[in-house]
Every structure is written in C-alpha cells, then in structure tokens.
C-alpha cells in the first residue's frame, strides 16, 4: 500500500524523530529531510551504538533507503561531507543513496561568524539571547529571503561563484568589522574549501520536485522528515525564541514541491514530558529534584550543542495548539520509560494569566511569558517500561497515563517508544509498518 507520511516534532524539538524515522523507513525506500540545517541533531541507536545525524535523513542507516535533502534545508558543505564520511566509516555504503536539491542554500563561514557575533552582542547589551546553536542557520535563511543566497547549483560555474562569494563576503565583513568589532572572514579561503567539496555536491544534486513527483507516479511510498519541533516554527512558534524555518506541515510542502493531496498520514512525535533548549517561554518547566532525575535518565543533553535541556511536564495546551496547525493523523509517544521512577506525574491542561483568565489556547509571546500552568496530577507507575514491546505488558498506571494524554489531546497515540534502541517500540496502528 502506498503511504506518504510526514513525521514532525510536536513540541520544542528533541522528541525522538530520528529513532521513529529509522524504524518506519525499514519498509519505505524514500526519505526526505525537509528543513533546518546542521542545527538539528537526530539520534539513532542500534544495539547500543549511537549515531547522531545533523543533515542526512535519519534513514541513512537503513541500507535500502534513498536519502533526499530538499531545498528547505540549508547545507553546510563541510559538515555534510564530514557526516557522509562518518557514515562510510561505519561500513555503510552511500553510493547512489543520497540526493540533494540543487536549490539548497549554502551555510558558509561568514554565516557562522555573524551568528556568533550577534549572540555575543546581545549578551553584552544585556538583551536576552535567542540561544542559537552558533551554526549560522539564521543568517543563511536571511540570505535566502534577501535573495543573495549562494545555492548548490551556483557551484557549477566556479568563476561566477567566486565573484558572487566575494561580494557577499564584503557585505558581511562590513558588519563584522564596523558594527560588531569582530574579525573579518577571507573569501579566498572559503572558496578553496568549497571547491574541494563541489564535485561531490554537484554529482548528487538534482531537481527534487520532479524526482519526488516521478516517485509518486510509480506509486512508491515516501517519508518526509521534519527537523526541530512545531513550537519552534518561525511563524507559529514561541517567537522570537524560534528557529529560522517552517517546522510545520506547510514547510514540508513548500520545501519539497510535493502535492499536499499526496500526503496520506501526518505523524506527530511527542515526549511523555517536555523539553526545550535555549531561551524562551516554557510554562511547565520543573525546578525541583524531579528535573534532575528526568535530565539524567532521559540523557537530556543537546545532540548538537551538548547543552542541558530544560525539563518540564507534558504541556497539552501547547500540543493542542500544534494540532490545530498541523492536522495530525496520530502521535508517537516517546520516552515513557524515563518516567518509570517518578511518583507523581503532571499534565498541564490549561494556563492561567495574572488577571485570572483561563487559556486553553495561546498564540503570542506576551501571553506565553505570563502564563502559569494548571495541572492534572496522576500517580506514577514506579515499575519498568523500558524495552516493553506490547501495550498489554505496560504497567496499568502507565496505560492510564497514556490514555489520559490521548483523551486530552483527542488524537490517537499509535506508536509508543519504550527506550532508545530502534526496537524498543510498541506499534498500535499496524498499518503504519505494513
């Protein structure tokens, strides 16, 4: 049966998309990474061996998949080549298995320098920093919107590319030197580094919309992989504490050129609790010892930055907002095992503002910053769920928690992850893996 599936994070990222896509792609031959850059970190664990992917689709470890990067992704050529080399060192062939949109914007040294300079400047002026990953992602997307981005296809004509590069570097150096008082970047050095990578990039770059539509006509199935999470969307997230791309369904459609009518299922990934990296509102944040228990057991450290993630209870208000925008067909609930030793587990069912107003939905930063959670408390199950592969074998209180979440968000939970390994999983909707 043909099934085109979109897989999206439905919180602030780090929900476990990598594992789920790796699992689902065993039966699907095409996986498309749709937005973001090497600020994302998707982790796949196979027999206790961890692989962290920043640019390549999370299906790359499945040897039968074709792994595609669409034009919504900003590409650091140096980091992409490093990642390809890392995969090959694991003994996994990538020959004829990676394709990149010729329209992907490049992330280059001056983007990184600008990103770092801005964050440093915000701290100096005592302005709240965004908490970026310092990977140059924001400036790269700015270039795309300003119509000055260098893209993969520009590498074909080296003379034209060098001229464009020189002009852009002059633009960035003016700001770095005169406003931020930082060191300039050298366009010759950037050019020479890129030329060494250009042959590989040109060999695997194609027109992605035409390719994907040809797959559709052959009745083949495709997974579309989102990065980050819907609450970090540039339009609908906790702006300005968001990423620089559209992390929602609309971003998938626009970055791939695929028809929305060809999508058969939209799978949201949610943790059994909440986390976020960096600054920004986080109404259910935990500050007592429970935070440290979840942090350590859940290994909640950023796969890209290594920073400790902020920990919070499950926020049903935020998730219901994301459901509005993405029309999820079902959810995968991850990291249920991390809560195995927690005596009391809380679910945020609504917010209250200082004026006493109760909110069941929220859309702007002013309300986010003032909102306090109203909780529904449930008893923890205090027994092992890790590695359980059948729903009936879960502790009764764990089942109750899952059923309560489902009754609040009113979308079926159809997959449950019970550990970090690709096989620690319960599939309730068997059609997703047929």
UniProtKB/Swiss-Prot annotation:
Amino acids binding Mg(2+): 14, 41
Binding-site residues for IMP, renumbered to this chain: 14-17, 39-42, 133, 147, 228, 243, 307
CDD domains given in the database record: AdSS (cd03108)
MF terms (GO), sorted A to Z: adenylosuccinate synthase activity; GTP binding; magnesium ion binding
Cleavable signal peptide: none
Catalyzed chemical reaction(s): IMP + L-aspartate + GTP = N(6)-(1,2-dicarboxyethyl)-AMP + GDP + phosphate + 2 H(+)
Cofactor binding note from Swiss-Prot or TrEMBL: Binds 1 Mg(2+) ion per subunit.
Record's keyword annotation contains Cytoplasm: yes
One BP term from GO: 'de novo' AMP biosynthetic process
Primary subcellular site in the record, as a coarse category: cytoplasm
SMART domains: Adenylsucc_synt
Active site per the UniProt annotation: 14, 42
Keywords: Cytoplasm, GTP-binding, Ligase, Magnesium, Metal-binding, Nucleotide-binding, Purine biosynthesis
Residues that, per the record, bind substrate: 303-309
Localization per record: Cytoplasm
Pfam families in the cross-refs: Adenylsucc_synt
GO CC aspect terms: cytoplasm
Subunit structure: Homodimer.
Family designation: Belongs to the adenylosuccinate synthetase family.
Official protein name in the record: Adenylosuccinate synthetase
Organism of origin: Wigglesworthia glossinidia brevipalpis
């Amino acid at each position: 049966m043909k099934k085109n599936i979109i897989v999206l994070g439905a919180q602030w990222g780090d929900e476990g998309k990598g594992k789920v896509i790796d699992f689902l792609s065993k039966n699907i031959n095409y996986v498309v990474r749709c937005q973001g850059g090497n600020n994302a970190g998707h982790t796949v664990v196979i027999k206790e061996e961890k692989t962290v992917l920043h640019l390549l689709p999370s299906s790359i470890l499945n040897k039968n998949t074709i792994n595609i990067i669409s034009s919504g992704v900003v590409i650091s050529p140096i980091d992409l080549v490093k990642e390809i080399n890392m995969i090959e060192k694991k003994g996994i062939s990538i020959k004829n298995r990676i394709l990149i949109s010729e329209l992907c914007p490049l992330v280059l040294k001056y983007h990184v320098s600008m990103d770092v300079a801005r964050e440093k400047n915000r701290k100096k002026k005592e302005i709240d920093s965004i908490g970026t990953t310092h990977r140059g992602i924001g400036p790269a997307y700015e270039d795309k919107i300003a119509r000055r981005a260098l893209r993969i296809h520009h590498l074909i004509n080296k003379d034209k590319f060098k001229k464009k590069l020189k002009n852009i570097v002059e633009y960035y150096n003016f700001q770095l030197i005169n406003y931020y008082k930082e060191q300039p970047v050298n366009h010759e050095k950037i050019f020479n580094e890129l030329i060494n990578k250009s042959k590989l990039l040109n060999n695997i770059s194609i027109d992605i919309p035409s390719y994907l539509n040809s797959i559709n006509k052959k009745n083949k199935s495709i997974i579309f992989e989102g990065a980050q999470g819907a609450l970090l969307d540039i339009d609908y997230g906790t702006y300005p504490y968001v990423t620089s791309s559209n992390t929602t369904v609309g971003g998938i459609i626009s970055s791939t050129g695929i028809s929305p009518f060809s999508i058969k299922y939209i799978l949201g990934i949610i943790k059994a609790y909440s986390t976020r990296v960096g600054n920004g509102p986080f109404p259910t944040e935990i500050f007592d010892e429970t935070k440290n228990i979840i942090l350590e057991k859940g290994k909640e450290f950023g796969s890209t930055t290594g920073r400790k993630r902020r920990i919070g209870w499950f926020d049903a208000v935020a998730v219901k907002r994301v459901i509005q925008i993405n029309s999820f067909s079902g959810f995968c609930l991850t990291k249920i095992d991390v809560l195995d030793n927690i005596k009391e587990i809380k679910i945020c069912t609504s917010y209250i503002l200082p004026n006493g107003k109760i909110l069941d939905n929220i859309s702007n930063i002013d309300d986010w910053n003032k909102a306090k959670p109203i909780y529904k408390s449930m008893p923890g199950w205090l027994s092992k769920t890790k590695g359980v592969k059948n729903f009936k074998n879960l502790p009764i209180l764990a089942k109750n928690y899952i059923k309560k979440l489902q009754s609040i968000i009113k979308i079926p939970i159809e997959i449950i992850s019970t550990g970090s390994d690709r096989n620690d999983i319960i599939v309730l909707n068997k059609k997703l893996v047929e």
